[in-house]
Structure formats: C-alpha cells, structure tokens
C-alpha cells in the first residue's frame, strides 16, 4: 500500500481528520471533532524508511501479530499494550492492514480514554 493509498483509506472513515500535533513529519489521523481534540486511531511517520504505521489494537491480538510478523512492533512512543507500530515493508498483506486499520478506528470510536 502506498502512502497515498494509506492516507486516502484512513480518511475514508466517517468523522476522521488529519492533524500534526507532533510536527509535520508525523501524520496523526483522528476520529471526532477538532474542537474537542479527537481520538487518535492511526499515526504515520511520513519520513521514516520504511514507513511506520501505528494503530490501536486489542492487547491479545497485538501480541499475536508481533509473534507472526517481524515487522509488527510494540507501539513507538505509545502504549505498548494497546498500540502496534507496523513497518510497511510488504510483509503484512494490504487486506490485513485494512482490517487492522478498521479495528483501530473502531477501538478509538468506542474508547473512553487512551
């Protein structure tokens, strides 16, 4: 999945928007309203090689994904229990990435806090 495809997919979810609270090199995708800061559901380190995509994840699934894929790591500068960082090398198939993005969106949409 290219950066543009990823960006377009992340913004295709209802009530999502792009923010840069950590600077221009980190794209933060949020659900909610800008007036209330929203809830993060995805982050992309735009300048990293390979790209790094961080997503919220169920803690048990997080551990399983890390066992299956060497490019799935504990969340970079995030809760290691509730976030994974995926190095976008092609190891994780695009269909699975889309599924993980959907899960992250759903978790953030229903989350009371991070």
Model-assigned labels for residue ranges:
Residues 1-114:
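Charge-dense, helix-prone N-terminal extensions
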């Amino acid at each position: 999945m290219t950066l543009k495809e990823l960006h377009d997919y992340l913004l295709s979810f209802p009530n999502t928007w792009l923010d840069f609270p950590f600077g221009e090199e980190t794209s933060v995708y949020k659900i909610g309203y800008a007036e209330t800061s929203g809830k993060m559901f995805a982050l992309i380190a735009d300048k990293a090689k390979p790209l790094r995509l961080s997503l919220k994840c169920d803690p048990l699934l997080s551990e399983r994904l890390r066992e299956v894929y060497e490019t799935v790591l504990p969340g970079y500068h995030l809760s290691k229990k509730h976030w994974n960082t995926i190095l976008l090398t092609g190891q994780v198939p695009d269909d699975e990435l889309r599924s993980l993005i959907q899960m992250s969106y759903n978790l953030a949409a229903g989350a009371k806090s991070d």
